[in-house]
A protein has these predicted regions:
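GHKL/Bergerat-fold ATPase module in large chromosome/replication-associated machines
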Residues: 58, 76-100, 120-123, 130-196
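GHKL (Bergerat-fold) ATPase N-terminal catalytic module, capturing the glycine-rich phosphate-binding loop
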Residues: 1-127, 134, 141
Length: 196
């Protein structure tokens, strides 16, 4: 079963989002993530109007959604392995959000991709389990695959268990009678970026 996992390292102030999807090869990582040095990013910046609604729609158009991670992270590390390749053919792509990135071949047992955000000191709040849960519920509750995190526990001697933090059922796959009015409103807000 496909899934997404979020792991938090409170000590190092980092967040890792992993999936068990098809993964990427080294060439695909360079092609898909290497746009940081391409003109698309500067073209995107030139297209900004100052109108929050219009500008947020440009993100997908220019493929810079991934690069918004540098708003909260000093460094982003992506590790991946394509389902078509062996464990010895994984890839690690890393960047500090400047006009360059590093790529290396790594050994990776799991097929899929992990994205680690090494948070800026001013953004350490995102390494908090409760904070991330609320973000997942607000913006990704309708994602059709389960998003798993460790439970937040106050018992120091107890190993936290995994729990699914989203409903993992897209609104459009449920019957109208199952969907509450608040769910429609939250979905609309997330989709349209209308947070008023």
């Amino acid at each position: 079963e496909f899934g997404i996992r979020i792991d938090i390292d409170e000590e190092s102030k980092s967040v890792t989002v992993s999936d068990n999807g098809i993964g990427m090869s080294k060439e695909e990582a360079i092609s898909n993530l290497g746009t940081i040095a391409r003109s698309g990013t500067s073209q995107f910046l030139d297209s900004l109007t100052g109108d929050q609604k219009k500008d947020s729609q440009l993100i997908g158009q220019f493929g810079v959604g991934f690069y918004s991670s540098f708003i909260i992270a000093d460094e982003v590390v992506v590790e991946s392995r394509s389902a078509k390749l062996s464990a010895g053919e994984g890839v690690r792509w890393s960047s500090k959000g400047e006009a360059e990135f590093d790529v290396e071949t790594i050994k990776r047992e799991e097929v899929g991709t992990s994205v680690t955000l090494k948070l800026k000191p001013s953004e350490a709040e995102f390494a908090d389990g409760w904070r991330l849960r609320s973000i997942v519920k607000k913006y990704a509750d309708h994602v059709a695959v389960p998003i798993t995190m460790k439970q937040v526990t106050t018992e120091e001697d107890k190993e936290p268990e995994d729990e699914v933090v989203n409903t993992a059922k897209a609104l459009w796959t449920r019957s109208r009678s199952e969907v509450k009015a608040d769910e429609y409103k939250e979905f609309y807000k997330a989709l349209s970026h209308d947070f008023q």
